[in-house]
Amino acid sequence: MSTLPILLATLPEAYLPFRPLVDVLPSIPVLFLLLAFVWQAAVSFR
């Protein structure tokens, strides 16, 4: 069971060029959350 997190954390060799993209993708929902706050601040929280 100790090898399972390692298998989930490493990409297969075929996908290694996409590693920077995979590192960025999980943060996109956080950016949408921040965008919602900026948008509401722009319209004065109607």
Swiss-Prot record:
Lineage of source species: Eukaryota, Viridiplantae, Chlorophyta, Nephroselmidophyceae, Nephroselmidales
SUPFAM superfamilies reported for this sequence: Photosystem II reaction center protein K, PsbK
Protein name as it appears in the record: Photosystem II reaction center protein K
Record's keyword annotation contains Membrane: yes
Membrane topology, from the record: Single-pass membrane protein
HAMAP family (UniProt xref): PSII_PsbK
GO cellular component, one term: photosystem II reaction center
Record Pfam families: PsbK
Annotated propeptide span(s): 1-9
Locations listed in the record: Plastid, Chloroplast thylakoid membrane
Keyword Membrane: yes
Main function: One of the components of the core complex of photosystem II (PSII). PSII is a light-driven water:plastoquinone oxidoreductase that uses light energy to abstract electrons from H(2)O, generating O(2) and a proton gradient subsequently used for ATP formation. It consists of a core antenna complex that captures photons, and an electron transfer chain that converts photonic excitation into a charge separation.
Transmembrane segments: 25-45
Subunit structure: PSII is composed of 1 copy each of membrane proteins PsbA, PsbB, PsbC, PsbD, PsbE, PsbF, PsbH, PsbI, PsbJ, PsbK, PsbL, PsbM, PsbT, PsbX, PsbY, PsbZ, Psb30/Ycf12, at least 3 peripheral proteins of the oxygen-evolving complex and a large number of cofactors. It forms dimeric complexes.
Family in the record: Belongs to the PsbK family.
InterPro entries: PSII_PsbK, PSII_PsbK_sf
